[in-house]
Swiss-Prot record:
GO biological processes: COPII-coated vesicle cargo loading; ERAD pathway; intracellular protein transport
Span of the signal peptide: none
Keywords (A to Z) from UniProt: Cytoplasm, Cytoplasmic vesicle, Endoplasmic reticulum, ER-Golgi transport, Golgi apparatus, Membrane, Metal-binding, Phosphoprotein, Protein transport, Transport, Zinc
Complexes and interactors: The COPII coat is composed of at least 5 proteins: the sec23/24 complex, the sec13/31 complex, and the protein sar1.
Pfam families: Gelsolin (PF00626), Sec23_BS (PF08033), Sec23_helical (PF04815), Sec23_trunk (PF04811), zf-Sec23_Sec24 (PF04810)
Top-level taxonomic group: Eukaryota
Source organism (scientific name): Schizosaccharomyces pombe (strain 972 / ATCC 24843) (Fission yeast)
Job of this protein: Component of the coat protein complex II (COPII) which promotes the formation of transport vesicles from the endoplasmic reticulum (ER). The coat has two main functions, the physical deformation of the endoplasmic reticulum membrane into vesicles and the selection of cargo molecules.
Binding site for Zn(2+): C56, C60, C79, C82
Similarity section: Belongs to the SEC23/SEC24 family. SEC23 subfamily.
Residues modified as Phosphoserine: S565, S566
Full protein name: Protein transport protein sec23-2
Amino acid sequence: MNFEDIEDQDGIRLSWNTFSATPAENARAVIPIAAMYTPLHENERMTIEQYDPVACRAPCRAVLNPYCHVDLRARFWICPFCFQRNPLPAQYSDISSNSLPLELLSQSTTMEYVLSKPVKSPPVFLFVMDTAVDESELTALKDAVIVSLSLLPPDAIVGLITYGSLIQVHEIGFEAMPKSYVFQPAADYSTMKLQQLLALSGNQIRSSSSKAKISGTGITLNLGAASRFLMPVQKCEMHLLNILEQLQPDCLEVPAGQRQLRCTGAAVKIASDLLGIAFPKCGSRIELFCGGPCTVGLGQVVSTELKEPMRSHSEIANDKAKHFKKSKKFYSSLAERLSNQGHALDLFAGCLDQVGIMEMENLVNNTGGAIVLSDSFTTSIFKQSFQRLFSVDASGYLKMGFMANLEVLTSKGLTICGMIGNGVGENKKGTNISDTQIGISKTNSWKMAAISPKSSYALYFDLGKEMGNPNSQRPTQAFIQFLTYYQHSSGTYRLRVTTISRSFITGNAKSISESFDQEAAAAIVARMALFKCQTEDEMSVTRWIDRNLIRLCQHFADYRKEDPSSFRLLPNFTLYPQFIFHLRRSPFLHIFNNSPDETSFYRHMLNVADVNDSLIMIQPTLQSYSFNEPEGVPVLLDSVSIKPDVILLLDTYFHILIFHGSTIAQWRNAGYQEQPEYVNLKELLLAPRLEVTELLADRFPIPRFIVCDQGGSQARFLLSRINPSVSFNKSSQFSPMSKDSETVLTDDVNLQKFMDHLRKMAVIS
C-alpha cells in the first residue's frame, strides 16, 4: 500500500490502514486510529460536478459513493453507513453496469459538488492597521495593503479600521473627503451602542440604496447603511487608496522610558462588532496588523512603562504575568464571537518584540486564520507572505474558502473521539460519538470560518461498543466519509466528499503492523502532544510521549526479554523513534529559548500542516553540497554531517539556512569564485541557492532565510536542531569522531543514547 498515492488522490493518511477488530488489540496498538485529512487538497484529476449530490435519508445523510451497493434492476442503492435502502433519483434512470455515474466509479473516492444554494454575500476583507509605528513601517504596511487590493476579486467587499492611541473606523463610501469615526480605547462599547454611534441601528442599516453584485451568480446584495464602511473594492478602490496614502503615524508623543499607546484589543472588538452587524454568518476575514503589543484598553498585554518587560514562559507558568489571564480571557471570548459569526482573523506581526500572539492565538486558531511572524513590515517575510495569502488557482479564484463545516460519518464498529486542528466543535452530536475524548470532542462536526488547500486536520477514532461484544456480529469493513461544506471564492457553495474504506482484522498482528504509517503517526502524536500542552507542562507531555513510544516498541518490536541487543523494529517502524527523538527536542516542546509568541506561532503552524510539512517541522531536512556531490544529497541531521569542505542546506520549515564549512567560507572570502579557473566553486556556492528558490515556491508563510559560516553566531540555528552525536569528545554511532566533525557543546542526550535507553526499557519483562 503506497500511502503517498492515497494522499495524492484523497488528501488523507491514516496511522493504521488496517484496524484491530477488538478493543483489547486496539488498546495494545498504543497509537489511536487517526487520519490526517486535508479537505481542500489540490488534485488535478478530481472532477467538479455542477449538481447537488445524492444523499441518504435523514438522519444519516451520507453521500452516494463508490462503496454503495447499487441494484440496477430495482433502482435503489444501499448506504454502507446505515444500511438504508434509497431510491435512485430520476436523472439516474438510464444508468447501467457499463454506464455508471461518476460518483460510483472506483476512482471517485473524492468528489466535489457545486451546490445550488445561493451565497449570502461575496467575501469580506476588513483591514485593521496599526498606526502606532514609525513612518517607514507605516509606509511599508500601506504599500502592502495597496498591493493586496489589486489581488482581490472585483466584487470583494473591503473596509478599513486604523488604531494607535485611538481607533478610527473609516468611511470609505464618503468620497468628498476622508471621514472617520473615532473611538476611545478605554470604553467597552456594546454592539448596540456601536450601532447607534455608527448610525447602523434600526432602519438606518437599510436606509441606503447601495447595492453590490456577486459575480457569477446574478445575485444582488443590498448593503444598506453599512456601505459607508464596507464596499466592493471595484467601487471604492480609488477613495480607499487616497485614505491609505494620507495615513500618518500616530501623532501622540511617546515620553522617554515608555511604550507607544496601542489599543489592539479594542480595535479588534470594534472590527468584530462591525462585521457582526453588517455581515453576520457571511464569509469574512479580518486582516489584523500589529506593530507592537497592546498597551492600553481591552486586551492589554503589557503596560506602557518600558521597565515592565514582556511576559516570559516562566512568568506565565508561575502565574506572575500581570495582564496575561485577563487578556487571554478577553481574546478567547472575542474568538468565540468571531467563530459564531463565521468570521476569521489573520494576524500579521511586524515587530522585533512580542506583540501578544499567545494572548490572541484563539482569535486565529478558532477561526481558521493565519499567523505571520516577522521582525518588521519592511521585510520580505511579511510582504511576500501577505501577498501569498491572496494567491489564486488556475481559474483565477482565491485559494481560500469561507464558512466551512467538516462533518465525519462512520460505519458500524467505528466511533469518533475528536479533532485536533484550527476550528471549533459544533453543537451537533451524531450516533457515532465515542466516550473517549481526544482534542475537540463530543461532536462529529466542526466549523472553520476560513479554510485553504493547506489546512489539515487530525481526526481520531475508536472502536464502537459492539466490537467488544463477542456475541455480536462484528463488521469486517469500516467506512469513513468526510463532508466539507464551504463557500468558494467564486461565489458558490461547494461540498467536498471523501469516502474511504479499511478492513477490520482479528488476531492478525502481522497485517496490522504492516499497515502502520509511521510518518502519519508522528504527525498525529505531535498534535496530541500540543493539545496536551494546553493543560499540562512540557515535561509531563514529554514523559507521556516517551511512555507511549516504549509501549509501542514492546508490542511491535522483535526481541528477547532482558536482551537489548536482540531488539529489532520492522521497516515501517524504524523511523518512528527518530521522529519522536526530534519532536522532544523541537521548539514545540523544548521552549527554553523561545518567547511565548514564538511558541504560539510554531504550534499554530504544526496544527495546520499536512504530514509532509509536519515532518519537516519535527525533523528538518539537511542536504550536503560538495565538489563530489555538487547537486546536493540528503545527509543525516547529525553533527557528523558538518565538515569544513561542504555546504549544508537546512530546512526547518520556519528557517532555511545555508551553512558554509570553514574551508568553503575561507575560499569564498578570498574571492576564488570570481576567478575563471575556480568556476566549480562558483557553481557550488550557487547550487543551494537554486534549491532555496524551489523550496520557497509555495511555502506559507515565507521562512526566514539565513546564510552563515561554520563558527559564526548564526550557525546556532543549525546546531540547535542536529543530533549532537559528537559532543564533549563522544564519538558518533554513524562514524568515528574525526578532527573534521563539529563538536556540539550541549547536555542534550543524543540519538544513540536515546535508542539505547529505548531498547533497554522495551525488553524489560
